[in-house]
Amino acid sequence: MNIVVSNVKGGVGKTTTAVYLAAVAGRRGRGPVVLVDADPQGSTAEWYDADPLDGVELVEGPSVRTVGKAMNQEDAIVVVDTPPGEGTVVQAALGRADAVVIPTRAGGVEPTRVMATLAMTPRNVPAGVVICSARLGTNDLDATVEWWTELNVPLWGIVPERVSIASGPASALSNEGLDLYAKVFKRATAKPR
């Protein structure tokens, strides 16, 4: 199962989402779990080095070859943290995806970036949006949820703005974050109907 975490825009929560999804998979013990850091910035690897995830192997390398090799593992759950943009690594990962998780924020230019990511995703691959760092109870969030609903884009999760979730390698993964991303993981790995 290849879960690709992607958005053409940077700074939307891709790394946080990828790390939490891999941690959830590792805790479920459903076979080998591989977390691929395909972003040249190396934030996923930095996070992993500071706080290794139980049951999760890290693969570093922002190259098409490295990503492809990692995603060819038959029995593994592979979570790929892609770089922003539409580069060859992103396209290669999306081309091998079994599910695409698209982290985004509420408001701003986010919808056009998500639509660009969806346009690069193969039609037969399930994809869903996760609104990260959401300010609960705001008009921006309500409008964003309404937008995705009207466009029939699956909303796989809303992750509220919490320092404990988005603090990166500075602290351990939060239980709240693990619970929220467990729901995203369940949607990403659901059998198509």
What residue ranges belong to the model's regions?
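Inter-motif core of Ras-like GTPase G domains
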Residues: G85-G108, V114-M115
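Conserved nucleotide-binding/hydrolysis micro-motifs of P-loop NTPases
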Residues: P40-G42, G108, A134-G137, V163-S164
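Arginine/glycine-rich "motif VI" loop of SF2 helicases in the C-terminal RecA-like domain
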Residues: G26, A119-V125, E146-V153
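Short, aromatic/basic amphipathic alpha-helical patches
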Residues: E46-D51, L141-L151
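P-loop/Walker-type NTP enzyme "switch/lid" segment
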Residues: N2-V12, V19-A92, A166-S174
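Beta-strand-loop-alpha "switch" segments that mediate conformational coupling across diverse proteins
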Residues: R135-L136, V145-N175, A188-P192
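Short, well-ordered beta-strand core segments
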Residues: V78, V100-V101, A127
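Conserved C-terminal guanine-recognition region of P-loop GTPase G domains, centered on the G4
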Residues: T112-S133
